Curated annotation (Swiss-Prot):
EC numbers, comma separated: 2.2.1.7
Binding site for thiamine diphosphate: H72, G111, H112, S113, G143, A144, N171, Y278, E360
Designated name of the protein: 1-deoxy-D-xylulose-5-phosphate synthase
Broad class of enzyme this protein falls into: transferase
Lineage per the UniProt record: Bacteria, Pseudomonadati, Campylobacterota, Epsilonproteobacteria, Campylobacterales
Cofactor: Mg(2+); thiamine diphosphate
GO MF: 1-deoxy-D-xylulose-5-phosphate synthase activity; magnesium ion binding; thiamine pyrophosphate binding
Keyword Metal-binding: yes
Positions of transmembrane segments: none
Pathway(s) this gene product operates in, as recorded in its UniProt entry: Metabolic intermediate biosynthesis; 1-deoxy-D-xylulose 5-phosphate biosynthesis; 1-deoxy-D-xylulose 5-phosphate from D-glyceraldehyde 3-phosphate and pyruvate: step 1/1
Single GO cellular component term: cytosol
Length: 615
């Protein structure tokens, strides 16, 4: 078959069912080929190939809003939308995004979960006000239905009666093992012993019944399917079709045409296999969700093994040690047990650590209640996903001044996932909150010390750490953690000082070493705490060093520069501050090293800028 992928509705309509199936197979090959080289979201995209093809065949992608929840199922859509020639650049610097992106022709940006139905509702309202006949189509996975926002939208959609199609991709998996009553609800009818035996009896009946009775028996079987799975949606006022085989193009196309003709809000419940078409990925929960480059034949990663432990692994081990030492430690993650390292604790202490699915707001508030009851919660969460629970952080933790620990993974630039996932805002949105303490480790030993301190600390506290490994290892001796105390790592008479925070200390040290090779020098401070700052040390520093460079992986606005300038103004100190934090723009995708170079935040670029201040 030609490697050209049909990408218009008209072209797809001309293909036979067999040709469409061949198209699906060739697309799977392409997705596997590209993801094996570039990394990406593999299993979820492989499971949604037929769904995307059917969407493009029944609806008009040029006018009907296609909304992909999270975008983990959008690769086939990209190929059908004419992106075949640049698909090899997926997730690469200046290449095709791994998520939906309006600048690439998609309807809406997506990277965080459970927004699709709300977007569909809003699109419905706009279309109605314009007097147009377009129909929004939202593709959402069963994992995304664990978030409350999806039900807020379904609640309004069912009451609105707008024409809208919600295509539910139920693969009985989210990123990790599915959690909660909703997941169980979606699968219970198909899993019951009664239904399975009933289905077998119907199959035997169909073999012996005359044609006239066969039709009625089939209709009876289909009606039985509706009793349990569809009840939730129908009670909300939505039409319901399914469950149907999400890999049977004929069934999907028929269901979409039926839903389109209804001119009402309709949920089509499809059941798919995550990782379909790549045997090594089928049936796996987390391993093949988001992957790096790998060998297609063996499934083994082709990335050179890093002998250094990741910051996540260090966090996980330290928390295990603390949990065995202090029985009042509890913890939670929102659908990212393996990503945050909390899976090890859930396995060892299932009554003290929980995965609550994609429910960041619930995660934070439930842990606030546990803190109120005398427990010490550790909330393990990606920096970018903490944004989803900001009100709960303020209302339920900060105002109450509760002893809650926020462990913010993936702080700083995270690479190929791009602007929806960069962890560069947490300092800016947490620093203004009264009662909050903020700090960051520079290396493994300091991570251990900070976590021990966080357990003992009174009040809400948050520490951030990077994706991957710490750059620094044992270049500097660790210090005891004391509230609001920094560590002076390199002390001399230079009028220039480097102030580092977290992973920024490593970048500052790399620049300083290059300067020392040129017979230049600078003071190096590990702030450790962003809030409160070590005012005593900084006042001493201001007497000798009049140029301060800030090294921190946060945006400038509300970051370390802002906090330092507030301090200088408070004491009427006159110091020139130069910040190497990120500018006021969203940071796009690409390998972290390439993104840093583009932003002129790599060591060579920073060194060039610093050298201008040496005479």
């Amino acid at each position: 078959m030609s490697k050209k992928f049909a990408h218009t509705q008209e072209e797809l309509e001309k293909l036979s069912l067999k040709e469409l199936e061949n198209l699906a197979a060739s697309m799977r090959e392409k997705i596997i080929q590209v993801v094996s080289k570039n990394g990406g979201h593999l299993s979820s995209n492989l499971g949604a190939v037929e769904l995307s093809i059917a969407m493009h065949l029944v609806f008009d992608a040029k006018k009907d809003p296609f909304i992909f929840d999270v975008s983990h199922q959008s690769y086939t859509h990209k190929l059908l939308s004419g992106k075949e020639e640049i698909f090899d650049t997926l997730r690469q610097i200046n290449g095709l995004s791994g998520y939906t992106k309006p600048s690439e022709g998609d309807y809406f940006v997506a990277g965080h979960s459970s927004t699709s139905i709300s977007l569909a509702v809003g699109a419905c309202k706009a279309i109605a006000l314009k007097g147009e006949k377009r129909i929004p189509v939202a593709l959402i996975g069963d994992g995304a239905l664990s978030a409350g926002m999806a039900y807020e939208a379904l609640n309004e959609l069912g009451d609105s009666k707008f024409p809208c199609v919600i295509l539910l991709n139920d693969n009985e998996m989210s990123i990790s093992k599915p959690i909660g009553a909703i997941s169980k609800y979606l699968s219970q009818a198909m899993a019951t012993q009664f239904y399975q035996s009933f289905k077998k009896r119907i199959a035997k009946m169909l073999d012996i019944l005359p044609d006239s009775a066969t039709y009625m028996a089939k209709r009876f079987e289909e009606s039985f399917k509706l009793i349990t799975p569809g009840l939730l949606f129908e009670e909300l006022g939505l039409e319901y079709i399914g469950p149907i085989d999400g890999h049977n193009l004929g069934e999907i196309i028929s269901a979409l045409k039926q839903a389109k003709a209804m001119q009402k809000p309709c949920v089509i419940h499809t059941q798919t296999i995550k990782g379909k078409g790549y045997a090594l990925a089928e049936g796996k929960h987390a391993k093949w969700h988001g992957v790096g480059a790998f060998d297609i034949d063996s499934g083994e990663s082709v990335k050179k093994s890093d002998t250094k432990k990741s910051a996540t692994e260090i966090f996980s081990k330290n928390l295990l040690d603390l949990a065995s030492k202090y029985e009042n430690i509890v913890g939670v993650t929102a659908a990212m047990p393996s990503g945050t390292g909390l899976d090890k604790l859930i396995e060892k202490y299932p009554n003290r650590f929980w995965d609550v699915a994609i429910a960041e707001q619930h995660a934070v508030t439930s842990m606030a209640a546990m803190a109120k009851e005398g427990f010490k919660p550790f909330i393990a969460i990606y920096s970018t996903f903490l944004q989803r629970a900001y009100d709960q952080v303020i209302h339920d933790c900060a105002i109450m001044n509760l002893n809650v620990v926020f462990a913010m993974d993936r702080a700083g630039i995270v690479g190929e996932d791009g602007e929806t996932h960069q962890g560069v805002f947490d300092l800016s949105f947490l620093a203004p909150l009264p009662n909050f303490t903020l700090l960051a480790p520079r290396d493994e030993q300091m991570m251990q010390n900070i976590m021990e301190y966080a357990y003992l600390h009174q009040g809400p506290i948050a520490f951030r750490y990077p994706r991957g490994s710490f750059i620094l290892d044992k270049e500097f001796n660790p210090c005891e953690i004391k509230l609001g105390k920094a560590q002076w790592l390199v002390k001399n008479s230079s009028e220039i000082a480097f102030l580092g925070y977290g992973q920024g200390v490593a970048k500052a040290w790399q620049v300083l070493r290059a300067l020392q090779e040129m017979n230049n020098n600078a003071n190096l401070i590990d702030l450790i705490f962003a809030k409160p700052l070590d005012e005593e040390l900084l006042c001493e520093l201001a007497k000798k060093s009049k140029i301060w460079f800030i090294f921190s992986e946060n945006v400038k606005i509300g970051g370390i520069e802002s906090l330092i300038n507030n301090f200088l103004q408070k004491y009427d100190l006159h110091v020139k501050v130069v910040s190497f934090e990120y500018e006021d723009k969203f940071i796009e995708h690409g390998k972290t090293s390439e993104v840093e170079k583009n932003l002129e935040k790599d060591v060579n670029s920073l060194l060039t800028k610093v050298l201008k201040f040496y005479h």
